[in-house]
Amino acid sequence: MKLIGITGMPGSGKSAITKLAEKYKIVVVSMGDVVRYETLKQGMPLNPENVGNTAVKLREIYGKEAIAVPCLNYVNEKYNNEDFVIIEGIRSIYEVNYIKKHAELDIIAIHSSPKTRFERLSGRNREDDSNDWNTFVERDERELNFSIGRVISLADYMVVNEGNYMDFVNDLENTFKKIINVN
């Protein structure tokens, strides 16, 4: 099984991979869903502060590989017979290193400017998103403290998402097809 890791700052366009995965019948496991699930398990409502604090606590408890460990266990238990599995939302170089110790992994980084990402996040109405610039910046700082910048800069592939959505999806699909060896 080969894993395809998707990384990028919040609002960069990582979730676009889900539509491509459906097209190619490839499973997607979201690391963010793991954190949101843990937040709800603790009885806390989903908002930027609670989800962010849960991510920090998970890393304090389990170390810097915290989200990768349960995520990879889940992938191995549920999808061991798949040729490819996408792990969406890798944020830490430690997570990358952990996964690479246990599986073949290629990383696709999706990049968008802070202004573009803030506009997207303000409009998508998810519980852990914010319409406030300062909260947005705090979230970015938290993500950068997880070493997501290193993951992005060391990614195997980079796709920029600043303009037309269909151009972005086409670029992402072309990158995706290189990894899964489809013409």
Curated annotation (Swiss-Prot):
Protein's organism: Methanococcus maripaludis (strain DSM 14266 / JCM 13030 / NBRC 101832 / S2 / LL)
Pfam family, one: AAA_17
Keyword entries, A-Z: ATP-binding, Nucleotide-binding
Gene3D superfamilies on file: P-loop containing nucleotide triphosphate hydrolases (3.40.50.300)
Domain of life of the native organism: Archaea
Binding site for ATP: 8-15
The UniProt record lists the keyword ATP-binding: yes
A GO molecular function held by the record: ATP binding
Name this protein carries in UniProt: UPF0200 protein MMP1282
Sequence similarity: Belongs to the UPF0200 family.
